[in-house]
Amino acid sequence: MTPSALKKTVLLLGTAFAAASVHASGYHFGTQSVNAQSTANAAAAEAADASTIFYNPAGLTKLDSSQISVNANIVLPSIHYEADSATDFTGLPVQGSKSGKITKTTVAPHIYGAYKVNDNLTVGLGVYVPFGSATEYEKDSVLRHNINKLGLTSIAVEPVAAWKLNDRHSFGAGIIAQHTSAELRKYADWGIKSKAEILTAKPPKPNGVAEAAKIQADGHADVKGSDWGFGYQLAWMWDINDRARVGVNYRSKVSHTLKGDAEWAADGAAAKAMWSTMLAANGYTANEKARVKIVTPESLSVHGMYKVSDKADLFGDVTWTRHSRFDKAELVFEKEKTVVKGKSDRTTITPNWRNTYKVGFGGSYQISEPLQLRAGIAFDKSPVRNADYRMNSLPDGNRIWFSAGMKYHIGKNHVVDAAYTHIHINDTSYRTAKASGNDVDSKGASSARFKNHADIIGLQYTYKFK
């Protein structure tokens, strides 16, 4: 793989795929409120606290006071892989580790504030994590020539306003300013040319395969990039009667152009010896600029709440997400690069994602005046069609959420929420063919199987200004 190949694939796949998290399908982080998490995110129509800013900002008109809500989610993802096969561009087996865990525990904070201007108008501000992911393989993994390390964090800042038209109807709107930063590592096999010369020698060398297999000349690049993008949110909430409420929330797409630089390193003596020769022969610079455009998708949520009694409430939510926006991605470089079949300044991938839906149901029961118990279940559809479109850094699959939690009032001003979620994720598999030669990527074919699940622990504190 040429230096351009590595850098190009790194930035493209890192930024395009990093937005996925093990505990939410596609790009989404999964939960932005512990109060919502306790019902598997089914309680958007409840509008229990200032975190309604994310799920339905029209719900701000339902709050009984100005307040601030601070949330923390501890995410314990578990992705274990087992490689079935991995060959380089010449067809020789890749040497290295064939199994392991590629995730670590992460913490995501969210904070919301609401201010009641008057009985009809409430304004608020949310700072939350809408998208995030982190996976890392062993540096000697046989899948290292695909993606070795992946990390992305998006932080959104959203001012909102909610207006109560009358006792039944409320409307809300927000402007989303989203900052996304990405980090990725990918390895390249710089010994491909030497291997190919040995394997295609005329007459054939008696021990050609064994000789070629001994050539280990990997290099790698670490890439970081960031960008601001902007979107909006629109919401409506309708109290049908004293027991039933429905809501609709729309979150727009957010477009990003992430730009980055690769920091190169040669691994081992053989790769270091090839470094200057490869750069000179192919006309590459060590820190060339590159860009890739990605779009985080819009979503539409319809949700409801029904008061069964003075103590019991039921919740439901259906969310549709336009993941099909991510059907193609291109990374464009400043200069054309020499590739196997000519020249190219870009790499194109076609993940061909499909639109998805998530369905959730939940409920709450008031045990005593200060204590409420909550629970929920949800089905979350994956946008990945099959193993041929799945990335090794994104082993996404259909998932089921099982959530439970509690809410405890301490006097008139303090509220504490706690929640636990276990996410069952279908076992998945991954297949990729070797690079076509039309771009600068020279990875070989590989396949792997994944066993995935996740657990989330949430803690939330709300202070009401009364």
Curated annotation (Swiss-Prot):
The keyword Transmembrane applies. Residues 1-24 form the signal peptide. Gene3D superfamilies: Outer membrane protein transport protein (OMPP1/FadL/TodX). One of its GO terms (cellular component) is cell outer membrane. GO terms for molecular function: long-chain fatty acid transporting porin activity. It is a multi-pass membrane protein. It is found in: Cell outer membrane. Its main location: membrane. Belongs to the OmpP1/FadL family. Present in outer membrane vesicle formulations which are used as vaccines in human. This is Putative outer membrane protein NMB0088. It comes from Neisseria meningitidis serogroup B (strain ATCC BAA-335 / MC58).
